[in-house]
């Protein structure tokens, strides 16, 4: 396992030796970090809007964790997070605790 840091979030993940693939224990694609940065900038630029956000194929949950930590207060009304991997509930709970995010 490796401790990965992306902006304000730290994740403990097992990374593949080569390319990212769907058979990973928990999916995380570091190349998409810039897309997550843009999403946070965009959502923070929307004025006076409490949003309902869905992240149905969350993988490691990095996008949702960053939303919870980096979006301005009051931006999120509800955040729905899920993934098909069997160990996702355990993983997201551990990462919420690791990053001191109250669920």
Where in this protein do the model-derived segments appear?
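SAM-dependent transferase fold signal centered on methyltransferase-like domains
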Residues: 1-103
């Amino acid at each position: 396992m490796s401790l990965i840091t992306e902006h304000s979030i730290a994740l403990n993940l097992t990374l593949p030796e080569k390319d990212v693939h769907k058979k990973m224990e928990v999916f995380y694609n570091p190349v998409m970090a810039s897309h997550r940065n843009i999403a946070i900038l965009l959502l923070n630029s929307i004025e006076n809007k409490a949003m309902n956000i869905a992240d149905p194929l969350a993988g490691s949950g990095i996008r949702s964790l960053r939303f919870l930590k980096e979006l301005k207060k009051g931006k999120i009304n509800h955040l729905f997070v899920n993934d098909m991997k069997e160990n996702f509930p355990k993983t997201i709970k551990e990462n919420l605790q690791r990053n001191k995010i109250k669920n």
